[in-house]
Design a protein with these regions (language model features):
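Conserved N-lobe ATP-binding subsite of Hanks-type protein kinase domains
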Residues: 35
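Conserved HxN/HPN-centered segment at the entrance to the catalytic loop
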Residues: 81-99
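Conserved short submotifs of the Hanks-type protein kinase catalytic core
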Residues: 105-119
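Activation segment signature within eukaryotic-like protein kinase domains
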Residues: 139-140
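Catalytic-loop of the protein kinase fold
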Residues: 151-167
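Conserved activation segment of eukaryotic-like protein kinases, specifically the C-terminal portion
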Residues: 189-202
Length: 320
């Protein structure tokens, strides 16, 4: 049992149950098709304490939801088995959720590691915007390491964003939400993702390479990490900053930005958000870029980063 995720039961009240096996005690996230709860196994209570997990719960209302669910489970299972990850625990596609009000629902669920430090998104925007180049470089290296695992298995995530990057109890990065992930090819045509992270080829309804799409999203993530702002308001030709990307006018894009970044960082981001997907930099080129080579990825520097994130977490908790 992991001591980091042990909690006193007296802190919580049951709000729902899955199959009379798992008690759910807190809602920690909600998306278009799924709700994420914090919960525990009723058969594994250790005295007054219990180990908590996260449960991604989907109401099974149509075949598309079940297809997406099965796809995510397959990918999580593959990544966990081949990379010795403890993130994925188990799943069920035929379960029942019992609410306290007596209502019950047919559901599918995925039981995953509870990542106690939450979304990276929160740490970027509060208490001050952005993490600066040095801290961002360390975090981005960890994100890239996670993406390498996904891409090495010939998958594309297709919904990379700061809200889908979680932090465990030691502030280590974990990418989550594989509902849109797909086997990579150059002829993907299904439209998905989050608007502020969409590459141009998706807007043009052209067949695209999923991993090149991930690179574009990583470029947006890097910009957000450093500055605490989005590079454009919306992925649309009507957005003046996105329009610069569509026309390849990167100097004009940067001249309109209020933030001042180093030349090497701007060059790297240019390569990642390049309009032409075939000319976008690869993961290997990101790692070997001048900006990434400026970093010192020592244990001591990661300790300093985690100290900064811990300070920010205290202020985030006060705000909430």
């Amino acid at each position: 049992m992991s001591s980091s995720n042990l909690y006193y039961l007296s802190q919580f009240k049951k709000i729902a149950t899955i199959d009379d096996k798992y008690n759910l005690v807190r809602k920690i996230g909600k998306g278009a098709t799924a709700t994420v709860y914090m919960g525990y196994d009723t058969s594994k209570i250790n005295g007054k304490q219990v180990e908590m997990y996260a449960f991604k719960v989907l109401k099974v209302v149509n075949d598309d939801i079940l297809t997406s669910f099965n796809n995510e489970v397959s990918i999580l299972s593959l990544l966990s088995s081949e990379d010795n990850s403890t993130y994925y625990q188990e799943h069920s596609s035929k379960s029942i959720l019992y609410k306290k009000n007596g209502k019950k629902y047919d559901i599918a669920y995925i039981k995953i590691e509870y990542l106690s430090n939450g979304e990276l998104f929160d740490y970027i925007f509060y208490p001050k915007k952005g993490l600066g180049e040095n801290f961002s470089r360390l975090i981005f290296k960890s994100i890239i390491d996670e993406v390498i695992v996904i891409h090495n298995h010939n998958y594309a995530h297709r919904d990379l964003k700061t809200e889908n990057i979680m932090l465990d109890d030691s502030f280590n990065v974990k990418i989550c939400d594989y509902g849109f992930a797909i086997k990579n090819s150059n002829s993907i045509q299904s439209y998905c993702g989050t608007n502020g992270y969409l590459a141009p080829e998706l807007l043009m309804n052209l067949p695209f390479n999923g991993q090149a799409n991930d690179i574009f999203a990583l470029g947006v993530i890097l910009f957000v990490l450093v500055t605490g702002t989005m590079p454009f308001r919306t992925a649309s030709p009507q957005d003046p900053y996105y329009a610069c990307i569509l026309r390849g006018e990167y100097e004009k894009f940067w001249s309109g930005c209020k933030c001042k970044l180093s030349e090497n960082l701007m060059k790297l981001i240019d390569g990642m958000i390049c309009f032409n997907a075939q000319e976008r930099v690869s993961i290997a080129e990101i790692i070997s870029s001048e900006w990434m080579k400026e970093g010192e990825y020592s244990e001591e520097n990661y300790k300093v980063l985690k100290k900064e994130l811990s300070k920010r977490k205290k202020k985030i908790i006060r705000k909430k």
